[in-house]
Amino acid sequence: MEYNILSCGAVADGRTNCATAIQNAVDTASAAGGGRVIIPAGQYLSGSVLLKDNVELYLESGAVLISSLDPVDIKPFPQGGNGVNPDDTADGWQSGFFLGASHAKNVTISGMGTIYGQGDQVFLDKNEDNGFHECPKTCEAFRPRMMLFEDVENFTVRDVTLKDAAFWTLHMAGCQNVRIDGIKILNDDRGANNDGIDPDCCRNVVIANCIVSTGDDAIVVKSTGPMSRRYGVCENITITNCVLHSRDSALKIGTETHGTI
């Protein structure tokens, strides 16, 4: 079954917040046992959207899904207990996330469209290195993650382009049976903290046939404090046939190493 977001009230003008329309389509598809949520060609601004069981978010060619940079529109991270504590902010747990899912299964993002994080509205070149243009740009705005998927079993991201993330691009935490295939991540090569793909305390992950260009780490396998407390080890991560470009590390294991990798 397919659910077109235009039928749920979305407006393709790049200015109207379509979060309610997109979330309604996702909720309806999941409640019906699963389905494909279609984002047709056009520009769609949105606040945070939570994907759910058995839902595929499909971006048609020419579709651009735009992350809001307004804190009011963005869901925060869970706090306290085994969640995010105040002393975890050094691990990058700030500002919430745009697209995500939590404790879900059979979630897919696919299609030939683009997810745009508006990082080019966040990173400013103040020429602090006197014209060498090598140091990270200054950050002067609210910066949500583009994606955070936590404890998702059978998670796939295929073919889409992820562009200009304001913070980490694709963060997977405690996920199992993951395939990231054929995607492009095109971020500012001087953007701070705009990691490409971050498997965090995940198991059984395949990252294949991807092009990733970032200012921070292109692919980094890690174990952050909150996710290590929840999910333990990070293991069975396969990376193959990818083209990686970074001003930091193209491929890194660690930095956040609170548990076993």
Model-derived segments and their meaning:
Residues 1-261:
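Extracellular/periplasmic carbohydrate-active domains that bind, remodel
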